[in-house]
C-alpha cells in the first residue's frame, strides 16, 4: 500500500530560553544564561517546515506547551494566585522557575515513538508518549503531549495513542530520538531499530553522562505499539559516545528507508548490528562515517547526524542539515564527498536553526516522523497540515505574541504568563485542537 512519511515539527514556545537544564547535552550547557530570541527561534522552525512542504515533503505542526507550567510549581509547595506563585518561586528557588518554563517540548522527536500500520499486529498507527524521565523539565511534558497527539490523531479507528510509561528510571524512555525504521517503500513492513543506553544487570554503560533510554523501556514501547515481534531489533548505543555528548541516538545516526547514515562509533557491537540489518532488510545500505574523517566531537558540535534524510519520489534522498555543518570545513568536505559517492543522497539542504541548536536541538530533534497511508493522512486533523495559509497565519501569530529577547529573569514576569496563555488559546482555535491545555480546562483565565 502507498504511504508517505509526514514530518510533524514542533513549534518553538514563547518561553524559549537558555538555562543549561540538560546535563549530557553539551550545547545546552555551553549556552547557559545567554539571551534568547523566541520570535526568531519560532520563525527559523517555521521556515524549515514551509521550505520542506514547498519541496513536496508532507509537513505538519505540533504546538508548544503551556509555560511557565504553574500546576507543577503548586505541586512543589508554592501557593497563592498564579502571580504570587511566580513571585515566590523567582525569589526562593529560581531554578524551578526555569525548569517549568522550558520550551523543550519543541523537540518533538522526544514526544513519542511511532509504529506505522504496516508494522503493527492490529493494522493501526500506534503512538506511545515518551516519559522523558531522565530530566525533570522534560518529564513534565507527557500529559500535554498525550492531549495534543489525541487532538491531532483523533480517529480512534486508525490511531492508538498510548500514555507514557511509569515515571521511574528503570523505564526511562526518550521517544523517537532513539528509534529508527528501515525497509523498502514506506507502506511495506519495516524493521524497527530501538536503541537504548543501559539495561538492568548490564555493566556496559556510560560513566560521565547519563544513559537516558533503557532497554526495558524500549521493549515496553514495542509491546504497546503492537509491533510485530519479527520486525524488531534492540541495539545498545556505544556508551563511549554518550560520554562525549551523544545523549540521544539521533545525534549520531539517522535512517530512512533502506539507508542507515551513522558514525563509525555509534553503536556497541556495531559490525554485528549492521550484519543483522543486512540479513533482515532488503537492499540495506550503511553509510558509516569514519572517525578519521569526522570525529565524534565534530559530529556533536555540528549535529551532522541530527539531520533529516528525506526520500524523493525517484528514490533519491535529500539530507537536511543545520548551518553549523556548512561552517565546519571538515564536515562540509566530507558531505561533498558523500554527494559524489555511490549512494541515494543527491542533495544537501541547509537551514539556519541557531536558536534551537544553541540549546542542543537540530533539524531531527524538531520533527516527529509519522508514516501514513493516504487514508490515514486524511484522518489526521487537517488544521495542523502545513500550507501557505497556515504558514502565514502562524507567522502572524508569532509576530503578535512572541518576544524578541528573553532572559532567565523575564520568566518571573506575570505578563509573560498571560501572553503565553492568550497565545495558546488563539493557537488551539487556529489548529482546531479543542481545550488541550490545563489552563483552558481549569477555566483559569489569565489570573
From Swiss-Prot:
EC numbers: 3.5.3.23
Residues at which substrate binds: 19-28, 110, 137-138, 212, 250, 359
Keyword Secreted assigned: no
Pathway: Amino-acid degradation; L-arginine degradation via AST pathway; L-glutamate and succinate from L-arginine: step 2/5
Keyword Hydrolase: yes
Signal sequence bounds: none
Keywords assigned by UniProt, alphabetized: Arginine metabolism, Hydrolase
SUPFAM superfamilies found in the cross-reference section: Pentein
Family: Belongs to the succinylarginine dihydrolase family.
Role this protein plays: Catalyzes the hydrolysis of N(2)-succinylarginine into N(2)-succinylornithine, ammonia and CO(2).
Name of the molecule in the record: N-succinylarginine dihydrolase
Organism: Escherichia coli O8 (strain IAI1)
Upper classification of the organism: Bacteria, Pseudomonadati, Pseudomonadota, Gammaproteobacteria, Enterobacterales
Gene: astB
Amino acid at each position: 500500500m502507498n504511504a508517505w512519511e509526514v514530518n510533524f515539527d514542533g513549534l518553538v514556545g514563547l518561553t524559549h530560553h537558555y538555562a543549561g537544564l540538560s546535563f549530557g547535552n553539551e550545547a545546552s550547557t555551553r549556552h547557559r544564561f545567554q539571551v534568547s530570541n523566541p520570535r526568531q527561534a519560532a520563525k527559523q522552525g517555521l521556515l524549515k517546515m514551509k521550505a520542506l512542504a514547498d519541496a513536496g515533503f508532507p509537513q505538519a505542526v505540533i504546538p508548544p506547551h503551556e509555560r511557565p507550567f504553574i500546576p507543577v510549581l503548586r505541586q512543589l509547595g508554592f501557593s497563592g494566585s498564579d502571580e504570587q506563585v511566580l513571585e515566590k518561586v523567582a525569589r526562593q528557588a529560581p531554578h524551578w522557575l526555569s525548569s517549568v518554563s522550558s520550551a523543550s517540548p519543541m523537540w518533538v522527536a522526544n514526544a513519542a515513538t511511532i509504529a506505522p500500520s504496516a508494522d503493527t499486529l492490529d493494522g493501526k498507527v500506534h503512538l506511545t508518549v515518551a516519559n522523558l524521565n531522565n530530566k525533570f523539565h522534560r518529564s513534565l511534558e507527557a500529559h500535554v503531549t498525550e492531549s495534543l497527539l489525541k487532538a491531532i490523531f483523533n480517529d480512534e479507528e486508525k490511531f492508538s495513542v498510548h500514555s507514557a510509561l511509569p515515571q521511574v528510571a528503570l523505564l526511562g524512555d526518550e521517544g523517537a530520538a532513539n528509534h529508527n525504521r528501515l525497509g523498502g517503500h514506506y507502506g511495506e513492513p519495516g524493521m524497527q531499530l530501538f536503541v537504548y543506553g543501559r539495561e538492568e544487570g548490564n555493566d556496559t554503560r556510560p560513566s560521565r553522562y547519563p544513559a537516558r533510554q533503557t532497554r526495558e523501556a524500549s521493549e515496553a514501547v514495542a509491546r504497546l505499539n503492537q509491533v510485530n515481534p519479527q520486525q524488531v531489533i534492540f541495539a545498545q548505543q556505544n556508551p563511549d559516545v554518550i560520554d562525549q555528548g551523544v545523549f540521544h541516538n539521533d545525534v549520531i545516526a539517522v535512517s530512512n528507508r533502506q539507508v542507515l547514515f551513522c558514525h563509525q562509533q555509534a553503536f556497541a557491537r556495531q559490525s554485528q548490528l549492521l550484519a543483522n540489518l543486512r540479513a533482515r532488510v532488503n537492499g540495506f545500505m550503511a553509510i558509516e562515517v569514519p572517525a578519521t574523517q569526522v570525529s565524534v566531537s565534530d559530529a556533536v558540535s555540528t549535529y551532522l547526524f541530527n539531520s533529516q534524510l528525506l526520500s524523493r519520489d525517484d528514490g533519491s534522498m535529500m539530507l537536511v542539515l543545520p548551518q553549523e555543518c556548512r561552517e565546519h570545513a571538515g564536515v562540509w568536505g566530507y558531505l561533498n564527498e558523500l554527494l559524489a559517492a555511490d549512494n541515494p543522497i543527491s542533495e544537501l539542504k541547509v537551514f539556519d536553526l541557531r536558536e534551537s541548536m544553541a540549546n542542543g536541538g537540530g533539524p531531527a530533534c524538531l520533527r516527529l516522523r509519522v508514516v501514513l497511508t493516504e487514508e490515514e493522512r486524511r484522518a489526521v486533523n487537517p488544521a495542523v497540515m502545513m500550507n501557505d495559509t497556515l504558514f502565514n497565519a502562524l507567522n502572524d501569530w508569532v509576530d503578535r505574541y512572541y518576544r524578541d529577547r528573553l532572559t532567565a529573569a523575564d520568566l518571573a514576569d506575570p505578563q509573560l504568563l498571560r501572553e503565553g496563555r492568550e497565545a495558546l488559546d488563539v493557537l488551539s482555535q487556529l489548529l482546531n485542537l479543542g481545550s488541550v491545555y490545563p489552563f483552558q480546562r481549569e477555566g483559569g483565565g489569565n489570573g
